[in-house]
Swiss-Prot record:
HAMAP family: FabZ. Belongs to the thioester dehydratase family. FabZ subfamily. InterPro entries: FabA_FabZ (IPR013114), FabZ (IPR010084), HotDog_dom_sf (IPR029069). The gene is fabZ. Its EC number is 4.2.1.59. The keyword Cytoplasm applies. This is 3-hydroxyacyl-[acyl-carrier-protein] dehydratase FabZ.
């Protein structure tokens, strides 16, 4: 049984109040279904206008896997901050670890990535999450990420 939803929809304005990231490195558009078990889903709409496509790759644009991992981490940051504070109170989030990372399918312009993140551990200000990046119901990447929240 899924845990109750705490925040149904976190829009871009709330994300901007929560995370320090800005263009071109803000890699989520919204976060939905933040649950009491510290899980949630980040959403990234991939367009041809992404700065990374200028060099990755001009003739056949593929969204870089490392940016998907960063999108997972940003989603986890929003979930962690809002779970701790109950609001979008801004906090610095530092990436600590990436484990068990796998890239399974390319992500192309026009795709919508959903970052399904679930907390797998917490110690004081450090959090660990498992994430699956999903496009059209198929897993395109997965990883375990760790981060630290600071004031």
């Amino acid at each position: 049984m899924e845990s109750p939803i705490r925040f149904a929809d976190v829009d871009i304005n709330t994300i901007l109040k929560t995370l320090p990231h800005r263009f071109p490195f803000l890699l989520i558009d919204r976060v939905k279904n933040i649950r009491e078990d510290h899980s949630g889903i980040g959403v990234k709409n991939v367009t041809f206008n992404e700065p990374a496509f200028q060099g990755h790759f001009p003739e056949r644009p593929v969204f870089p896997g490392v940016l998907m991992i960063e999108g997972m981490a940003q989603t986890a940051g929003v979930i962690g901050i809002m779970s701790v504070t109950g609001t979008e109170k801004p906090r610095a989030v530092y990436f600590l670890t990436i484990d068990k990372c796998k890239f399974r399918k390319p992500v192309l312009p026009g795709d919508t990535i959903e970052y399904h993140m679930k907390s797998i551990g917490r110690r004081k200000t450090m959090w660990w999450f498992h994430g699956d990046a999903i496009v059209d119901g198929q897993t395109v990447a997965e990883a375990d990420v760790g981060a630290m929240l600071t004031d």
